[in-house]
Each structure stands twice: as structure tokens, then as C-alpha cells.
Amino acid sequence: MEEKSEDCKVPEDLFNGLKVADPQEGESASPMVSDPKGQHCQSKLPKAAEAHPQDDHVEEECFHDCSASFEEEQPGAHVAGSKASDDSSSELDEEYLIELEKNMPEEEKQKRREESAKLKEEGNERFKRGDYMEAESSYSQALQMCPACFQKDRSVLFSNRAAARMKQDKKETAITDCSKAIQLNPTYIRAILRRAELYEKTDKLDEALEDYKSVLEKDPSVHQAREACMRLPKQIEERNERLKEEMLGKLKDLGNLVLRPFGLSTENFQIKQDSSTGSYSINFVQNPNNNR
């Protein structure tokens, strides 16, 4: 029994030897040795204790917090990452706003609308100065603030943000914003026209033509839409012919690869189009070089 008690004292002596000599640091040193994890947990407790008294305030202002976090998560350098996060955040914000409005007082809605209008004007000023990234940020904050019941206001904000993104060559996200603006206000000609321009720049000519036609239906005096409706059909036809030639070229290469082991090529198969019906016929030619 005595030997066991002496063995038990060894860790205690070692423990005492590891203590810091400074009496002011003695209390903080002993828990570091006895339980390193405990110190880690204790370091978090004051933060939690400080945050706890503000829980009610945070819950009340969570809408503003979402706006702040959205702004912080939009670094200009992260192009691919920011696009995905911006889009998903906007979708969540729309749903969140609708849920929030169920119990929101009318005064609060008007207050948020006024704050959103200020942010929009701030974005407009930044856009005029050429600060397109900052303008995009202001419009995003305004969208976070503006209640979903004010659909026309939100439609303008989406269209404005699309313009800011368009200036930064963020064409796909700009198209998404235009589509949201049109969804909220189907008669919003500026958003439709802006999306048509973006479709044309991304070589989506069919979609662009449809939007230009939609603009003319709503306002026949828009010269840009009328000119595009005259110009795009020919471009679409030329593009389709080019794509058809590319496809036939690829099929020809594939055919030559298959026929080569048999001593044949696609030159042995001549394709002729019937001018009256537009249909094609294929004729086999044994010596295609002799027929030229």
C-alpha cells in the first residue's frame, strides 16, 4: 500500500514542477496542464456570455444582419464563387422576405421601402461615377431591404443591378437579374430590352429576337427593337447554316474513320438535295475521282 501511495505522488510532483513560478499566472497555467481542452472551452464562454444579452436585439435585426453578411460575401476577386453565392443568396432573400412580411407591421414595410430607395439612389450615383462594383453592392443591399410586396420597386432594383453587372461583364448573372425584374413586372420594357441585349451578346439570338419582338408589341416606337427584329433573322439563318456545316464536317470525319478499313471514304457517297422538296438522296460512287 505504501508503494502505491508513493507512485500516486509522482504525477503530483511532476505536475507541481510544471507550474509557472509567477503567482499571477499560476491560476491560468494549471488548467492548461491539467485540461488543455478546458481552456479552449473557457475561452469561448465569455464570447457566448457577451452575445447572450443581445439575443433579442439580434433576432429583431436579423434582416439587417442578413444584408450585412450578404455584402461581406461579395469579394470582387472571387468571380466563379461569387456568382454562385450571389444567385443563391438572392433566391433565399426573396423567400425570406415573403415569410418576414406575414407579421410585419405596415409602418415597418414603409420604413424599409424608404431605406431601400436611399440605397438605390446611392447605387445610381455610384453607377454614374463608373463604380459598377460598388453600385452592384448598393442595389444588392436595397434588394435585401425592400419588402417583397413592393414588386415594381424590386423590379427596378433587379434591372439596375443587371446593368451594373453587365458593365462588369457578368452577363449570365445580369440575365438572371433581368429575368427576375420581368417576372415581377412583365411590362417593364427597359428590363426586357436589357435582357435582349445580353442574349445577343451571349449568342442566344433566338431568345434575343423573342425579347425584341416582345418590346415592339408593348411599344412599337422603340427603334432599337425594330432594327433588331429586321437584323436578327438573317443572323440566325447564317448561324444555323454554319452549325449545320460544322455538324456535317464532324459526321464526315466520323464516316471516314469508319470506312477507312474497307478502302472507302465519304467521297464514295454523294449527297444530293432535291430543290423542289428539300429532301436529300445518297448515291454510291465506286470511283468518285473519275466523276469530277
UniProtKB/Swiss-Prot annotation:
Does the keyword section mention Repeat? yes
Organism the protein comes from? Mus musculus
Q: One matching Pfam family, short form?
A: TPR_8
UniProt keywords, alphabetically: Phosphoprotein, Repeat, TPR repeat
Q: Where is this region: Disordered?
A: 1-125
Is Transmembrane helix a UniProt keyword of this protein?
no
Acidic residues: bias regions: 88-98
* Residues annotated with Phosphoserine modification: 90
According to the record, where are the TPR repeats?
A: 116-149, 155-188, 189-222
* Designated name of the protein: Tetratricopeptide repeat protein 1
Q: Which domain of life is it from?
A: Eukaryota
| Gene label | Ttc1
Q: Where is the composition biased (Basic and acidic residues)?
A: 1-12, 47-64, 99-125
Alphabetical GO CC annotations of the entry are: cytosol
Q: Please give the subunit comment from the record.
A: Interacts with the GAP domain of NF1. Interacts (via TPR repeats) with HSP90AA1 and HSPA8.
